[in-house]
Amino acid sequence: YYSPYVEEIGTDKTGLGRWSWIRIKGNNNLKTMIISAYMPCKPRKQSMLSNYAQQERYWRMRGEETCAKNKCREDLIKFILESRTKGERVILMIDGNEKMRTGALAKRLKQRDINMRDSICEKVGSKKFPTWFRGQEQIDAIWVSDELNVESATMFPFFFSIRDH
């Protein structure tokens, strides 16, 4: 592996690329799961090639008529709960494509059994800040388990590199 601290690496079991993760083991055998995730959003224009459409086809071919975004959220929550149940700390870096202060994912991550907080929002305070160049809301976040201490955080301006978030 990459470091003696890295215990395991993996991806979303569906193969859809919804998230990837790395589990590290630090001092006192404390384990932390670091997850990088993308939650699809329904495109403004009908597109067979969008990530959302691809994921909906995947589920439909398996007999599930479901919203790709809702399914991703449900599966991600289940994955995080498995880690939390094992006593692991979790860091979730996500392009959530929904409001990170008041959306369904935010509400669920704040509940007692998961107990996570948005570290960016914590550092920025109550200021409203968009995280997508065409948006008005924070749709990206770095959620951390409540027992983790975040010392600092920063955000790059839009178009700092090739990204639009």
Protein language model regions, located:
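Active-site regions of metal-assisted phosphoester/phosphodiester hydrolases
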Residues: 1-113, 147-165
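Short secondary-structure transition/capping segments
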Residues: 104, 129-131
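His/Asp/Glu-enriched short active-site or ligand-binding loop at hydrolase and phosphoryl-transfer sites
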Residues: 113-128
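Conserved catalytic core of two-metal-ion nucleotidyltransferases
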Residues: 132, 139
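Short glycine- and hydrophobic/aromatic-rich loop-to-beta-strand nucleating segment
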Residues: 141-143
